[in-house]
Amino acid sequence: MELTLLGTGAPEGLPRPDCPCASCATAVGDEARAATAVLVDGALLLDLTPGPAFAAARAGRSIAGVRQVLLSHPHDGPAVEFPAGLPAPVRVPDGRELAVISGHRIRAVALDAPGTGYEVTAADGERLLYLPPGAAPAGLNGPGPGPDRPGGPYDMVLLDVLGRPDALARLRSAGAVTATTDVLAVHLDHDVPPGRELHRQLAAAGARTVPDGTTLVVGDYHAVPDLPRRTLVLGGARSGKSVEAERRLESFPDVLYVATGGTRPGDADWAARVALHRERRPGSWRTAETTDLVPLLAAEGPPLLLDCLSLWLTDAMDSVGAWDDESWADGGADALAARVAELVAAVRATPRTVVVVSNEVGSGVVPATASGRRFRDELGRLNTMVAGECEHVLLVVAGQALTLR
């Protein structure tokens, strides 16, 4: 099955006319995108883009052989240009199947938002799933085939990856997307980050995007985004490090969020911060409040998000009496070193996908107290040792993630 992406952008395209935002200002060349439309084997057209005949011609294709045009957008969506010579576009009712003279079988997929998704099966059995912007499949309740998703994993999925990362998480949870599925981001709007940051965020989700006019063959080998198993995200206070860490896992199901800060009775500010974090996280994530990280790292299971090492270190230093100079000299330093070594070894040996958050505190004002300087030094050492065990290390500054490794 051969796909030509006549457009990969949102319905309004990218850049949007007269929009001064950074994404629109930098959407030039390959980053400029028309409304998403996909030509399948020259015979099936999924959605319409402005000037589809011209878009196809620029890609070295023709729409003269199109036998079916399917619309996925909501009925009250933007008006579409309908060129002469094409079959009248239709929407297939949810759950209905359609056989096309070209040999393709099409099934309409019910969604959790207005619009229609389409599962397309070629004569040789290759399967793709196409979803409209802002939508996820409805009824994905568990892994394996069922009436809502027969046939096992898809060979290719095209969806709004950054707009609905939970849609990709649901598909992964149901076994409809696996490591062999080619995940393509489409419907890209001006709320996506500009330039290389877009491709970095997509790679972290196990997805990619291609320029308008690209032709792909379903099942062909391609460079699958390398998903790091262990990632350390560093940053200062309010730098956006936790948001970045959450973003790296929001397209994966059943994440366990490990909060090392615990509860602080009577601290309204702390309670507000915790509530904000919980609101931001996907509803499918679970939360554990603990500083006992080694058993979690040693166990098999879904991805872990550990937030954060600085609070873990505070608790560890409390337990060994590190704030008192005499206790520190009388075995406290050695006890802390042993606990740090145990944690670092657990990060090295963990079978799980792990994203670890930590503060970067060594670049600011020198702490006024000996205990403050001790904490700064120990956190710097801890960050260095954990970074040494991670495939990917990021530094977040002003909400921008800089790749260190």
What are these model-predicted stretches?
Residues A43-D94, G151-V157:
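Active-site metal-binding motif and surrounding structural segment of the metallo-beta-lactamase
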Residues P137-L140, P145-G146, R164-A176, V243-E250, ...:
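A short, acidic, amphipathic alpha-helical segment used as a generic capping/interface helix at domain edges
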Residues R61-G65, F82-L86, D148-P153, L171-T180, ...:
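Short, conserved loop/helix-junction motifs that constitute active-site signature segments
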Residues P137-A223:
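Cap/insert and terminal regions of metallo-dependent hydrolase folds
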Residues M1-R61, D94-R149, D212-P225:
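Core dinuclear metal-dependent hydrolase active-site scaffold
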Residues P225-T231, G236:
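Pre-Walker A (Motif I) flank of P-loop NTPase domains
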Residues G9, G235-A299:
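Conserved P-loop
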